[in-house]
């Protein structure tokens, strides 16, 4: 074969081979390795207590100051200041579904606790909407009351002996029970099953201390808000959440694959938190709570928000210290 023909055949063969080679891919390379999502901002693993936390016990922790009779001629410095200001500053949060959360349609804060605050405003100003809301984490509640950056806290706040050393409380306006929330089919049925499991609780709550007392081998992940606990449970970064059944019901209402399990770990009586030096405001708030117990308002608020917990058993009875 002539040299020219050989050269032409070689060039043609090379061109065909190049043409048959797969083209270089221009698609981006995808990293298929799995990375666990980060914990929410402010989350941490609580240090295990070196000794079992003591029970919080004292005589009649839920007893409060009796409402003043109508027309009582006594100094009311806090109430005078509030009426002059024309607004009531209320500490609560936006992550407690059913109790205080933002309505997705209106953007307004709504819920059982919000309605309790509105009734206090109604009696104080003749208007249920004279409220300024301050968003607090559970760990910020006591300090906010002590430095008077809020007038009251209505935020699923359990009345305890230790907290009574720092602030005053109204009478009980709701009675909850601490329980456990898990993913259906998890195999966890009680607090005993939380041994060596990861459990979410919010920093600064009674739930955290009680969980460490009844199940010290659990690893407790603390977060700023209960809505953060819902996220880490859904992402399987924890095995359970433990707090008041009322809060757990609000979380479970957002995810059909969650369930509340086990018996009550402890009663959780909610009270309105008030500065220690505001005795007249304590008595006033207790007057409002007496009214809504007797005129049916409490039951109407319950039926608006909390029927997921079952039919209303009626408002908690008031206990007074004087």
Residue locations for each model-derived region?
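C-terminal motif of bacterial Sec signal peptides marking the signal peptidase cleavage site
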Residues: 15-19
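Short loop->beta-strand "edge-of-pocket" segments that line small-molecule binding or catalytic clefts
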Residues: 89-92, 110, 191-207
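Extended ligand-binding regions for polar small-molecule ligands
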Residues: 38-73, 205, 272-310
